[in-house]
A protein has these predicted regions:
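Extracytoplasmic/periplasmic substrate-recognition and gating elements
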Residues: 342-412
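Conserved N-terminal structural module of periplasmic/extracytoplasmic solute-binding proteins
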Residues: 2-153, 401, 457-485
Length: 485
């Protein structure tokens, strides 16, 4: 489609926000705590949350603060002071009210704490743990920067050592946490409070109708939404404006940043960057678990990347095609951008990334959000009971935040756009993590393997075999060092 030169890999600040499903955790009740007032409140209403599960946490007054380090997260979606709350903004109201409910229930005020930037924060956390300083109660990490440092420096405590935490509660993503266990410990957590971030596929409803193409919502619901189907529908749109050049002024079936969003195709097609051996527990580079399938996916994506029906801009020095201007049927899109897209005039729909084929059972979306960690100093010098209870309530009272967030993403009330909201539900419920992405900075070779698919698309001289020869062994050594295996 267009001539492209190889580009140097640019480490991505996945400073994203977003969401997931919602509610929070059950915990232990102290014997001397009032038994009549729990997290459900005196009226039994769970802070207007939609879940039926209610954490059994007694009302008390710790009279303290809960200090949160947030790296790579949109802070306004986590904690919002009253003076920053915009009147009439339902999302601001929900975030603010969540903090009020936690304070009323536990006498704990949630505040942000400074631990440096995304490069230095892990070192500062490790230092507070080493000296036994209970300065921070929660760290929300970058998607991968600093995560392995926190693990290898023994700076995080096991979530199951927090007395109040019940990982079986609906607001914890236990499946994701299981995939990230280290030595059978849950050092990295994930709950609805994190407001997940991933990539999705948006489509132009008017363009779809004008070209009389299949309804993608029906394809998703009927489990027929596959890579081949996406690219087949996209191939129906390829219109040059007459100047003989393929630019943002022409019309395409599919568009997007030809870098980070391409990585999610590996996950959506039910393959992993790094997996764990069920027998030995050893983490290993997993690209060769199904070489034939991987080669097939690479061929499909690179063919799309070069086709005249696609406009995929490169990793750097690019001109992006703005989806809202109506020049693309589909676009690979970050869920963080849906709120701003909903303010545009374009009529759009939202889809999960496609499956590899119809035989694949589930849709899968790669988590591009950071993770939760509780500094080990909490166990040594702090109050694990209080920390666990706060984490419970923060997740539980995210119900109204989720509803407001959905409506901002859709540009309409959920009740008025149920079909679109159902797609968002599918996306959030399909969220998975990959230890390869989390360990991206464990070595330069692991970084290369994480970005393998977009790098192959950008450079015709690169291929799967050469990538594995050049990076597999070194990446494995990095994993072995991180997990001491």
């Amino acid at each position: 489609m267009k001539n492209r030169l190889p580009h140097l890999i640019a480490m991505l600040l996945a400073c994203l926000m977003l969401l997931s499903s919602v509610s929070i955790l059950a915990g232990c009740v102290k014997e001397d705590a009032p038994a009549t007032e729990t997290a459900s409140g005196q009226n039994g209403a769970a802070g207007e949350t939609s879940t039926e599960y209610v954490p059994d946490i007694a009302k008390k007054n710790y009279n303290t603060t809960f200090n949160v380090v947030a790296i790579g997260f949109n802070q306004d979606l986590l904690i919002l002071d009253e003076d920053k709350k915009r009147d009439g903004n339902s999302l601001d109201e929900a975030v603010y009210e969540r903090g009020v409910l936690v304070k009323e229930q536990l006498g704990v005020e949630c505040k942000f704490a400074d631990a440096g930037d995304w490069i230095s924060y892990s070192g500062k956390i490790a230092n507070t743990v080493q000296i036994g300083d209970d300065a921070y109660q929660l760290v929300l990490t970058h998607v991968y920067q600093g995560v392995t440092d926190l693990v290898t420096s023994n700076s995080l405590m096991n979530f199951t050592d927090l007395p109040s935490v019940n990982l079986d509660a609906p607001y914890w993503n236990r499946n994701l946490m299981e995939s990230l266990k280290v030595d059978d410990r849950y050092l990295l957590g994930y709950s609805d409070f994190c407001l997940s971030s991933t990539h999705c596929v948006v489509f132009n409803k008017d363009m779809l109708q004008n070209y009389r193409l299949e309804d993608p919502y029906a394809l998703v619901n009927n489990k027929k939404w596959t890579v081949d189907k996406l690219f087949s529908l996209a191939s129906a749109v390829s219109e040059d404006n007459g100047d003989g050049k393929w630019t943002v002024d022409d019309y395409y079936g599919i568009s997007g940043w030809g870098w980070v969003p391409l990585i999610t195709f590996i996950t959506s097609c039910d393959m992993k960057i790094v997996d764990r051996d069920e027998d030995t527990g050893r983490y290993y580079v997993a690209y060769e678990d199904n070489t034939e399938k991987m080669l097939s996916l690479i061929d499909k994506v690179t063919t799309m990347y070069k086709a005249n029906y696609s406009y995929m801009w490169p990793s750097v020095n690019y001109t992006a095609l703005k989806f809202a201007e109506g020049h693309s049927l589909f676009q690979l899109y970050s869920t963080t951008g849906l709120i701003s897209l909903a303010t545009e005039k374009i009529r759009f729909g939202v889809l999960p990334y496609p499956k590899f084929d119809e035989k694949q059972e589930n849709y899968r979306s790669l988590n591009w959000n950071g993770l939760m960690g509780v500094p080990a100093s909490v166990n040594k010098a702090g109050n694990p009971q209080m920390v666990g209870e706060v984490l419970e309530l923060l997740g539980y009272y995210t119900g109204t935040v989720k509803t407001a967030y959905y409506e901002l993403q859709l540009g309409a009330k959920v009740s008025e756009a149920q079909e679109d909201a159902d797609m968002l539900d599918i996306i959030w419920k399909s969220l998975v993590s990959d230890i390869g992405l989390v360990c991206c900075n464990s070595s330069g070779s692991m970084d290369n393997l994480v970005y393998m698919l977009p790098m192959i698309c950008e450079s015709p001289k690169k291929n799967f075999s050469s990538f594995m020869r050049s990076n597999k062994d070194s990446a494995q050594k990095g994993l072995d060092k991180v997990f001491k295996q």
